[in-house]
From Swiss-Prot:
InterPro entries: ATPase_V1_Esu. Coiled coil: none annotated. Signal peptide: none annotated. It comes from the Bacteria. GO terms for cellular component: proton-transporting two-sector ATPase complex, catalytic domain. Disulfide bonds: none annotated. GO terms for biological process: proton motive force-driven plasma membrane ATP synthesis. The keyword Plastid does not apply. One of its GO terms (molecular function) is proton-transporting ATPase activity, rotational mechanism. It comes from Clostridium botulinum (strain Eklund 17B / Type B). This is V-type proton ATPase subunit E.
Length: 196
């Protein structure tokens, strides 16, 4: 019986030793797997954080760029508004010219134009109060032999200045048209003077 007890005891001891070895190896494998997974997770975490930081920087740059563009656009819009006001004020001042100044303007423009001499002079309400048939007769005398400009019965729908019309063709000398052409030519110069 003692042999059987010894044999049983040895089998149990061997089984216990094998169990310890298997558990030790399993624990070691488990630790290695966990360490690998933690290392991989840390690496992925680093990549995710770097990507998030890169995206955050790019988003911040886009927001700043958009804000700067919007500020430039607002500044440009404000400058254009000021320039438009300058030209609108110019039209208003021209419309408020004295009768003598307006007559001088009409006379100078007509005498310096290459006209056939038989055009119709179209004025707005205010212009009709300043220019009469006597002025037109004097103008025709100064034009000379081809001077046959007539004062039109038509009242122009414009702020100031005048239109010369012949056979449906108009030469637009309204203050709006003249200032508009100057705006195209002098817009940059006015901006330079105003904003430098």
């Amino acid at each position: 019986m003692s042999n059987i007890d010894n044999l049983t005891s040895r089998i149990v001891k061997d089984a216990e030793d094998k169990k310890r070895i298997i558990l030790s190896e399993a624990e070691e494998k488990k630790s290695k797997i966990i360490a690998k997974k933690q290392e991989k997770a840390a690496s992925e975490e680093k990549i995710i954080i770097e990507k998030a930081e890169t995206e955050a920087v790019a988003r911040e740059e886009r927001i700043i760029s958009s804000a700067e563009l919007q500020a430039r656009n607002e500044k440009l819009k404000s400058k254009q508004t000021v320039i438009s006001k300058v030209f609108e004020t110019t039209i208003e001042e021209l419309c408020n010219a004295s009768s003598d100044d307006f007559k001088g303007f009409v006379k100078t423009v007509i005498l310096n134009s290459a006209l056939a001499g038989d055009e119709n002079l179209i004025l707005n309400e205010q212009g009709k109060k300043m220019i009469d048939s006597d002025f037109v007769a004097e103008l025709n005398r100064e034009i000379g032999s081809k001077g046959n400009i007539t004062l039109s019965d038509k009242t122009g729908n414009f702020k100031g200045g005048f239109i010369l019309e012949k056979n449906g063709i108009e030469i637009n000398n309204t203050f709006e048209a003249l200032v508009s052409s100057l705006k195209d030519e002098m817009g940059l110069e006015v901006a330079r003077v105003l904003f430098s």
